[in-house]
Amino acid sequence: MRVLTVLPQHNLQDVPAEAAAIEAAGYDGAVTMENKYEPFLPLAVAATATDRIELSTGIAIAFARSPMVVAETAHDLQTASKGRFTLGLGSQVKGHNERRFSVPWSPPVPRLREYIEGMRAIWRCWEKGEKLNYVGEHYQFTLMTPNFIPDRNGLPPVPVTIAAVGPAMLRLAGRVC
């Protein structure tokens, strides 16, 4: 059994010591959440202060960000952590998507499936040199020029988990995670 704990996010200057303490205490990982604070930046800081623990978003709100932007952030975190990053995503509810993030609402299961498929196509483009050609109903990624391709990191693909509430999202988790 793996045991993860929450990484305090309220003060980035405290993150190195907090992350090191989590690692020294024997935890298997540290998780950030998208509540009051952005979930990715503390993990970047923690990656520089740790060597062993898994670093994970638990969860980041997907639809508020482009899959291309999240793919890039996740790739950078995977590189900085030397393969210890896990991307946890969630769809959030309709009201938050529309009124808090000002993004259009659509059924979350097919949209999150495409979101993850699109990111994986982007990562394959970057890491394996595949032509980027992902076309779905919600997301289309067909342009990638050399100037925007990060250096290959030679690490395993970023693991993706999702917050699943309800039978349809649970089935999706079983298929894509």
Q: Where would I find each of the regions flagged by the language model?
A:
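Acidic, glycine-rich active-site loops and adjacent beta-strand->loop/helix elements
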Residues: K36-Y37, I59-M68, S91-G95
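Generic recognition of short, well-ordered alpha-helical segments
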Residues: A17, L41, M68-E72, R175
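Residue-level signal for the nucleotide or nucleotide-sugar donor/cofactor binding architecture
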Residues: H10, A64-M68, P107
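Generic domain-boundary/flexible-linker signal
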Residues: D14, L41, S66, H96-E98, ...
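Residues in well-ordered alpha-helical elements
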Residues: Q13-P16, M68, P110-R113
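Internal, glycine-rich beta/alpha segment that forms the wall or movable "lid"
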Residues: A71-V176
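N-terminal beta1-alpha1-beta2 module of alpha/beta enzyme domains
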Residues: M1-T57, F63, V158
